[in-house]
Amino acid sequence: MRVVLICPYSLSLPGGVQGQVLGLARTLRERGVSATVLGPCDGPPPEPGVISVGPSVLLAANGSVAPLALDPPAIRRTLEVLAAEQPDVLHLHEPLVPGPALTALLAGNVPAVGTFHASGRVPAYVWLRPAVRAVARRLGLRTAVSPEARALAERWLGGACQVLPNGVEVERFAKADPWPAPATPGGTGRSILFVGRHEPRKGLDVLLEAFRRLDRDAVLWVAGEGPNTSALTATAPPGVEWLGRISDRELAQRLRAATVFCAPSLHGESFGVILLEAMAAGTPVVASDISGYRDVARREKEAVLVPGGDPVALAGGLRRVLDDATLAGRLVEAGTVRAASFSMERLAARYAALYESLLARSGSPDVRGTR
């Protein structure tokens, strides 16, 4: 079976959607599916099996910025690649976001699965409701990564949408070599890790204030960058290490090494895949008590969840995990089991079955192993 997975966001940049598309494609290939990824790239494709439609531009979207490719050359390149690849199935991630995924859907000549990642409010769904509903009807099957993403898609686009949660490449995180422990005043080598874009909805300012309230025998590793980086670094307390953008390999190593992983987001998270990655790495999690995280980590079972936007509560949650080895061990044990239940292997098997059912419904031949 030939499948082309299309991502609207730059595959050269870190992001939840990009990571899911690339990880799913890798795992599908392990199952014998011919899986090609198509999307914007700002430079050479990040790995084999990826085809670029050209560079991206940053546009404001859903409280963040999105690296999209909207120009005529990207549209032309998308159509050229589809003509050359001759896929049996398209798997379009965020299929209504302008760019290669929407272009492929409008071309309308290949059975398509659409996966919706966004939660909250998407203004285009509201303003252009009749148009986006008409375009969404071109999808043969619809999936969403969380109940919140499904609710958004079904409310504004109509039609049924089944939840297939994001997956995690468990072995990649579980078997990573831990990053060296940092030097701390008391010699404990304890570290708190934050990973994410430096923008208001990620709550990094809340974490910095919480860290200010902790004792100094720990280091706060901050990975990522964004529009608020300069302002945050200027007011950060001592003990913060600003890592900038890190590679996938370093991410896995730092997750393995961290004493605790912290996700202080305020909103806009439809599914906390980074929480799963921390659990797979064997690291306890402290996170905001928001819907996208509650679907992944249950309170006091796989994570300590605290009210979002409250630095006092966040400091208390971090202190509990840092100071209570029994609690940390219990979170790690439960988190490891939880991460395994979201394995990318399981997700790939479910999507392979969906592709087959879509082909059967559309009357297309089953071409496994023939191309």
Locations of regions flagged by a protein language model:
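Conserved donor-binding/catalytic core segment of Leloir-type glycosyltransferases
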Residues: 4, 180-212, 221
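Carbohydrate-associated surface elements
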Residues: 41, 148, 167
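Nucleotide-activated donor-binding/catalytic signature segment of Leloir-type glycosyltransferases, i.e.
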Residues: 230-250
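Short alpha-helical donor nucleotide-sugar binding micro-motif in glycosyltransferases
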Residues: 245-246, 254-258
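Acidic donor-binding loop of glycosyltransferase active sites
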Residues: 256-270, 283
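Conserved acidic donor-binding segment of nucleotide-sugar-dependent glycosyltransferases
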Residues: 299-300, 304-311, 320-326
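A short, well-ordered alpha-helix in the C-terminal region of glycosyltransferases
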Residues: 327-341, 353
